[in-house]
């Protein structure tokens, strides 16, 4: 589905790079501009991702006709082809749904004015210190007529947006603490109050950008050329590199090794894949032979929830937010805390009592028409997406593994499925993978390339991007469940 936006209305300023990085092939005037004394920015880094070799991304984008259409749609709608889009190129079915949903949230008719939408995106991304997304939406905020003074800090924004800060904070880091009192405080704030429709729009935006921050860090997305950290004015050290090389597959810089398993023998990582395949086969046989009781499955959930508290990285250090990002939110010390740490007990969220399909979907669609359907489609695509491959193996049913990943994320948020045996999680997800999952979902600003490289070492980069799509959609659904349940309780 083509995005409904005229190309001649596109915002082209941020990514008009072909002129800046001109060459004989694309018609630009690099040499001429330099002779005139114009400082010409050149991209830092080696492509859209710091974790994935550029040539793998560009190869996929150049071979798939569907991708060309999606790229044209994205550029027409946003005036740019950002690095997130380029990394999602591995999974065109998901990318199409993602772009369609994001376009609707930001640009189509809805309860919130356009500049509010981008400012909320800034607030949400800033909670995870995601300067990449903050920079993108600062530009968009100004383009749609936002007041530059608001960008000096949240205290300079309208009180109505300042009031949203508490919900943003809790939703990003400890969504299980959200109550109907949070909702009531926003809906009954006298002249600064939110309508229910506005609040649902805001909640969807917050959860969308919290999750997108996870994808940004989880895939090592590089800064855009027009943003801080994305360019240099120094002469190129290897050869003149032009943006037009993206379209013809030329590369002028050395690529990272294709295999992400650094310092690990091929045989070791091969046996890891074989062991995982064998565990999946054994679990399927156990499923067919006997089924655990409800009491046993409830006990296994509690065990897994407790164990998830002790999954952390050896690199787990506090990251101090830069002032350029931290000014967009309050209480910078507030962050993720494990579900049941310090003896605090929060009741388990049972999906059988409140779920997206039966409750959240209809509430969103009622207050913000069509968005529920778009989000639901995106959830289903991410959850069911499969190419029936695992590393070098083909014709593999990966549904068991995908469900374990999804349910592990929800388990970390205290969300339980009565019909799932949580004993499968420890069988299928090893410690390095759990560390990566928890970091991407809970504290994405702490993700490192070492974490990315250390899990599923024999798997393709496209499969790791697929994992990140599962992580961000499971996270978004978990946040939505807590927020929408609180709204439902307020309404009843």
Curated annotation (Swiss-Prot):
Gene3D superfamilies: AhpD-like. Widely expressed. It is found in: Nucleus; Cytoplasm. Keywords: Cytoplasm, Nucleus, Oxidoreductase, Phosphoprotein. L-leucine binds at residues 386-389, 398, 463. Residues 321-492 are annotated as: C-terminal domain. The active site is at 130 (cysteine sulfenic acid (-soh) intermediate). It catalyses: a hydroperoxide + L-cysteinyl-[protein] = S-hydroxy-L-cysteinyl-[protein] + an alcohol. Coiled coil: none annotated. It comes from the Eukaryota. The keyword Cytoplasm applies. One of its GO terms (biological process) is cellular response to amino acid starvation. One of its GO terms (cellular component) is nucleus. Functions as an intracellular leucine sensor that negatively regulates the TORC1 signaling pathway through the GATOR complex. In absence of leucine, binds the GATOR subcomplex GATOR2 and prevents TORC1 signaling. Binding of leucine to SESN2 disrupts its interaction with GATOR2 thereby activating the TORC1 signaling pathway. This stress-inducible metabolic regulator may also play a role in protection against oxidative and genotoxic stresses. The N-terminal domain may have an alkylhydroperoxide reductase activity. Belongs to the sestrin family. This is Sestrin-1. It comes from Homo sapiens.
């Amino acid at each position: 589905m083509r995005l409904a936006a005229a190309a001649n209305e596109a915002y082209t300023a941020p990514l008009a790079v072909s002129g800046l990085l001109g060459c004989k092939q694309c018609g630009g005037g690099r040499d001429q501009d330099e002779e005139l004394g114009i400082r010409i920015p050149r991209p830092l880094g080696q492509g859209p991702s710091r974790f994935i070799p550029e040539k793998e991304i560009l190869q996929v984008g150049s071979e798939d006709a569907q991708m060309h259409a999606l790229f044209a749609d994205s550029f027409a709608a946003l005036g740019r082809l950002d690095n997130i889009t380029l990394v999602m190129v591995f999974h065109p079915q998901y990318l199409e749904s993602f772009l369609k949903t994001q376009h609707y949230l930001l640009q189509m008719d809805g309860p919130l004015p356009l500049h509010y939408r981008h400012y909320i995106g800034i607030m949400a991304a800033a909670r995870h210190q995601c300067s990449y997304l903050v920079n993108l939406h600062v530009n968009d905020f100004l383009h749609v007529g936002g007041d530059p003074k608001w960008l000096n800090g949240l205290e300079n924004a309208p009180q109505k947006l300042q009031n949203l800060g508490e919900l943003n904070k809790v939703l990003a880091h400890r969504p299980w603490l959200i109550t109907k009192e949070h909702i009531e405080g926003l809906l009954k704030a006298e002249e600064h109050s939110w309508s229910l429709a506005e609040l649902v729009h805001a909640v969807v935006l917050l959860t969308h950008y919290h999750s997108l921050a996870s994808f940004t860090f989880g895939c090592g997305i590089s800064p855009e050329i027009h943003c801080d950290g994305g360019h240099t004015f120094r002469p190129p050290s290897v050869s003149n590199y032009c943006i037009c090389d993206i379209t013809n597959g030329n590369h002028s810089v050395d690529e990272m090794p294709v295999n992400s398993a650094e310092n690990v023998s091929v045989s070791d990582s091969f046996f890891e894949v074989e062991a995982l395949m064998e565990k999946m086969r054994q679990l399927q046989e156990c499923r067919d032979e006997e089924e655990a009781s409800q009491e046993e499955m409830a006990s296994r959930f509690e065990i897994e929830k407790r164990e998830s508290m002790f999954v952390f990285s050896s690199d787990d250090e506090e990251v101090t937010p830069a002032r350029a990002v931290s000014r967009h939110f309050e209480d910078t010390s507030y962050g993720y805390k494990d579900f049941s740490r310090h003896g605090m007990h929060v009741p388990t969220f049972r999906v059988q009592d409140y779920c997206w399909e039966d409750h959240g979907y209809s509430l969103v669609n009622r207050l913000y028409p069509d968005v529920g359907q778009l989000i639901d489609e995106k959830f289903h695509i991410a959850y069911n997406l499969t190419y029936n491959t695992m590393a070098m193996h083909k014709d593999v049913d990966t549904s068991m593994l995908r469900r374990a990943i999804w349910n592990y994320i929800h388990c970390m948020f205290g969300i339980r499925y009565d019909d799932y045996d949580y004993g499968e999680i420890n069988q299928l997800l090893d410690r390095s993978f759990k560390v990566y999952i928890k970091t991407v979902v809970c504290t994405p600003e702490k993700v490192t390339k070492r974490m990315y490289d250390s899990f599923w070492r024999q798997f393709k980069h496209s499969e790791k991007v697929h994992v990140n799509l599962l992580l961000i959609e499971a996270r978004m659904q978990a946040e939505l469940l807590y927020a929408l349940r609180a709204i439902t309780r307020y309404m009843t």
